[in-house]
């Protein structure tokens, strides 16, 4: 019974495993030209659905209300979309001499290029009791920035790997990402009261569509006899991903708790999660567009598929530790505050 409850709670993780297993058993269903016609249903309809859904769910009023914390927002966005990918690129120059599968290493670079997620960083920040408004702003604003910056970063670091012309990539991004997102925001203005009252399961809808994208991506992998993923590379990538997450969480903690940083303990909590978390919901569709038709797309996607559950797992484990630190710091501030 407890196992069923756990599976119900983590249904998306179970879904990823089942999607990959299903693709392994019968890859012909989800390949290009197959019964599912992913070149249409996934490349256009599924991706557009995810971003229309994002447009409906993103609360623009919360973006404007949190604008005053400019220093905090700059820190998070620069760390996420500049420092993170640049550091990963330098790290990969060292890893390139190892026997790790080169396409998994390229996949690590794509992780670095991704924007923050819309949900997980906010959920964990709230669980600790950190600056939730800042987390909401940076998750939403980072998603908007990511629509433009992430494809540019992917082309900057991995441009030679993509067989799709630059103009083709951005025209498809515009039609399947920007337009649905804007339409979603416009529709939201007219049905905002209904959305607040009914609270549709936006996360579950996007996650379900995402499972279809993951399934078809791995159908391409398993239908290609030239692709072989060795277990040694996979285990090393798993270790590297957890190491990267821990290192960057520690780094953001050190930077944001310096005496002259100007950040409160609650700000630090938002910084730790928002700066180090990466979006799977936005990332996989973007990889599908930027690397459309690429025979190694699924291998490139593997690190991001690992990073997503890893960041939730690691964040959840660290919630009690970070919370006790934040509470003790806040008590310390109150004790040192002069009484009148």
Swiss-Prot record:
Entry keywords, A to Z: Amelogenesis imperfecta, Cell membrane, Disease variant, Dwarfism, Endoplasmic reticulum, Golgi apparatus, Ion transport, Membrane, Sodium, Sodium transport, Symport, Transmembrane, Transmembrane helix, Transport
Cytoplasmic compartment residues: 1-10, 59-71, 138, 185-201, 256-270, 320-340
Family named by the database record: Belongs to the bile acid:sodium symporter (BASS) (TC 2.A.28) family.
Entry-linked InterPro entries: Na+/solute_symporter_sf, Put_Na-Bile_cotransptr
Native source organism of the sequence: Homo sapiens (Human)
Membrane topology summary: Multi-pass membrane protein
GO biological process: bone development; heparin proteoglycan biosynthetic process; intracellular calcium ion homeostasis; sodium ion transport
UniProt-recorded name of the protein: Sodium/bile acid cotransporter 7
Gene3D superfamilies linked: 1.20.1530.20
Function comment: Involved in teeth and skeletal development. Has an essential role in the biosynthesis and trafficking of glycosaminoglycans and glycoproteins, to produce a proper functioning extracellular matrix. Required for extracellular matrix mineralization. Also involved in the regulation of cellular calcium homeostasis. Does not show transport activity towards bile acids or steroid sulfates (including taurocholate, cholate, chenodeoxycholate, estrone-3-sulfate, dehydroepiandrosterone sulfate (DHEAS) and pregnenolone sulfate).
